[in-house]
Structures are given as C-alpha cells and as structure tokens.
Amino acid sequence: MKKKKRFKQKLLIASLVIGLMAVLSGCGYSTDPITSESTGFWSHYIVFPLSWTITWFSDLFGGSYAVGIIVVTILIRLLIMPLMIKQLKSQKAMTNLQPKIKELQEKYSSKDNETKQKLQQETMRLYQENSVNPMMGCLPLLIQMPILLGFYQAISRTAEIKTDSFLWMQLGNPDPYYILPVVAALTTFLSSKISMMGQTQQNKSMAMIVYIMPVMILFMGITLPSALALYWIIGNIFTVFQTLLINNPFKNKREQEALAAAQVAEDRLKKKAANMKASKKGGKKRK
C-alpha cells in the first residue's frame, strides 16, 4: 500500500515537472506580435490581456515595464489568493489528521486486498468528514502553468516589453550575470520550505518537490527571459509572506512538537499502567 502510494506521488510529481517544462517550452505557439487583432482563444483572451495590463501599469509608473510586471504579478497572486488560502488550510487539516490516519494504518495493517481496500475506504471517509482534499496542493501549480506561459508569450510577443531595460539586463533576454535566476531559485526553495514546515513526516512524502523545483527554476531562468525570473521572485516573496500571515508554519511546528510530546507521555503512562496491572495479577497468582 505504502509503496503503491509513493509510486503514485512520484508519478504525480514527474507529471507536474514534465508538464511545467512542456508549458515553458512553448512548442507550437505563435510568435507573431501580439495585438488586439490577434486571433485564436489563447492569443486573444490570455496573452493580449496580459500584455495590455503590463503595458498599462508600465505607463502608469513612468514607462517601466519591470514595474508593470511586478504590479501584475502581485495582482495575479491576489486573485488566486482564495485558492492558496484553501490549499494552506487543507495542508493544516492533513497534518492534524495524521495521528488518525496512523491509527487506521495500524488497525488495517494486513496485506490482503480486502484489508487494503478497507483502509482506503476508511481513509477517504476521514478526508470527506473533515473536508480535506489530498490533491489540493497541486491545484495552484496547475493553475499557474498557463499564467506562466501567458507571461512568457506576452513578453516575447510585445516588442516594447522585450526590448525594455531593467537594472543591468534587457527584460526579453536572459540575465547575463545569472543573478536573477539564482535569486529566483533561492526564493522558490524558501517559499516551498516554509510551506512544508510544521507538517508531519508522512505529509513530507511530497518534500522532494522542494528540491526539484528550485533546480528547474534555476536552469529555466538561465535560458528564458529575465522578466520571467522577475515574475518568479516577486511571486515567491508574496507566497512567503502569505504563508507566514495565514498559516504560520513556526507556530504549527511548535504545536506539532507539543502534540507529539503529549502523545509520547500518554503512551508511557498507558504502558506503565499496563505493567502495574500485569504485576498485580502476577502477585495474586503467586498467593
């Protein structure tokens, strides 16, 4: 059961990684300049609105397209914040359910198919009773994939954005000094690590993504426009503050440690009581 579960989780992570790489490769998309006359659902309803919004905010802030990208990134994060809050609550609920899940696993520890099926049913019932969706953690990433590709195309297909300069780099070109890709990778790691804090070891079976994503971001940031690295950095910083404010991981970690200590103390008391009861029975038999 555990091996099968781990395999499914690894398969899911691999699918997400491959999907992200495929999305960012942009295979087969149009390279024509984006305008209000652009045809096709993707170009007309996704890429052009992003390009127009970045341009509008850039004009509002003195013609800096980098500032426009930063503002639009924050707006997108605010729009998907309800979903992120739901994800954080789901993660916390999953963490709180781990002791009960462990009890079920001990109760249905047999390896026969009937017991495995019963364990699966009881686990799903527990999730439903507590309104927990184990797959909720993947949904924000899936939603951000098309947004990321839309950003990429808006930058690549808007000459004004592509040729605009920010600090030492051109937004449409990779950072020549690799500073932004490194910062993007580090903030990705920090964001993921903080999100995983306070979770139980069982929940951390997905923790490999904490190390996979920064490496991917680093390599993609080296080859893709620096504007995307800027998008990642701002988004990651926003996520860090959002996590700290909504679902304080340091507080959660202390709570989990306190619960674990209380559980250990309770187990010791039960064991001590059982030993005393057994010794009393043994004394009566000798009499």
UniProtKB/Swiss-Prot annotation:
Residues 1-26 form the signal peptide. PANTHER family: CYTOCHROME C OXIDASE ASSEMBLY PROTEIN COX18, MITOCHONDRIAL, OXA1. One of its GO terms (cellular component) is plasma membrane. It is a multi-pass membrane protein. HAMAP family: YidC_type2. Keywords: Cell membrane, Chaperone, Lipoprotein, Membrane, Palmitate, Protein transport, Signal, Transmembrane, Transmembrane helix, Transport. This is Membrane protein insertase YidC 2. A lipid is attached at residue 27 (N-palmitoyl cysteine). The keyword Ribonucleoprotein does not apply. Belongs to the OXA1/ALB3/YidC family. Type 2 subfamily. The chain crosses the membrane at residues 65-85, 135-155, 178-198, 207-224, 228-250. GO terms for molecular function: membrane insertase activity. A lipid is attached at residue 27 (S-diacylglycerol cysteine). It is found in: Cell membrane. PROSITE patterns: PROKAR_LIPOPROTEIN. Required for the insertion and/or proper folding and/or complex formation of integral membrane proteins into the membrane. Involved in integration of membrane proteins that insert both dependently and independently of the Sec translocase complex, as well as at least some lipoproteins.
